[in-house]
A protein has these predicted regions:
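N-terminal secretory/targeting leader peptides
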Residues: 2-97
């Protein structure tokens, strides 16, 4: 089934609050993650690093301005419902879960 539909599994799972994130650019292939600076921590950060992203450790209050200035390319926080209240969608319009 997987080969027939060109599907490739990526081992991961629900890691708490770091489950998805807001991205300044659209991600179409795993290659798009190469060198991408993302505010993400813990095991999710380790997974993203294996995919080529560069995990960044910045305080929650600095996420919006860092996305706005382009200091980081992507960020995770709580989840889309709460994150939209903080306006992340205005500076990073692509959300992936």
């Amino acid at each position: 089934f997987y080969k027939k539909h060109n599907l490739h599994g990526i081992v991961g799972g629900n890691t708490g609050t770091q489950m998805g994130g807001w991205f300044r650019k659209e991600i179409k292939t795993p290659a798009d993650l190469q060198g991408l600076k993302m505010r993400i921590a813990g095991i999710a950060g380790q997974v993203m690093a294996k995919l080529g992203a560069v995990p960044q450790q910045i305080p929650g209050g600095d996420i919006y301005p860092a996305l706005e200035r382009g200091t980081i390319d992507a960020a995770e926080w709580v989840g889309p419902y709460d994150d939209e209240k903080l306006g992340f969608n205005k500076v990073a319009p692509f959300y992936y879960y």
